[in-house]
Amino acid sequence: MWQGRFYSCPLDQSHLWTALRYAELNPVRAAMLEAAEQWRWSSAAVHCGAAAPEALLAMDRWRARWTAAQWREYLAEGDSPREVSALRQSTYTGRPLGTPEFIAALERSTLRLLAPRKGGRPKKGPPDSRQTNLSLIA
């Protein structure tokens, strides 16, 4: 399931649910079974109401947002290609995935630039008036 690698990135609340759905749908995506809740090593069965929660699985935050029926419906919607692409890009680079406000708050708290910047060298600005024009000297 993890393909021998570990990837992570900071996620805001809405992208947390996207990432959880993505992880729970991995066995389905790999054609290992038809429904996510059938995968024994996943939290999907608990989230879908097909199994009792284990002691290690904290459910309070999840229960505050979802019911088992809502989660089954959310899983049935599947991942959108745009969401999957954004999630993969962020996990490969380690950059945060969230709203601009979320990323700005992380930048303030870490004192680091976290949002991707434009590639390439900086554009040249207007010529500096203090530079000497060598063509006038000769």
Language model feature labels by segment:
Residues 1-138:
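Short Pro-Cys-Gly-centered "Cys-loop" motif that presents a nucleophilic cysteine in a tight turn
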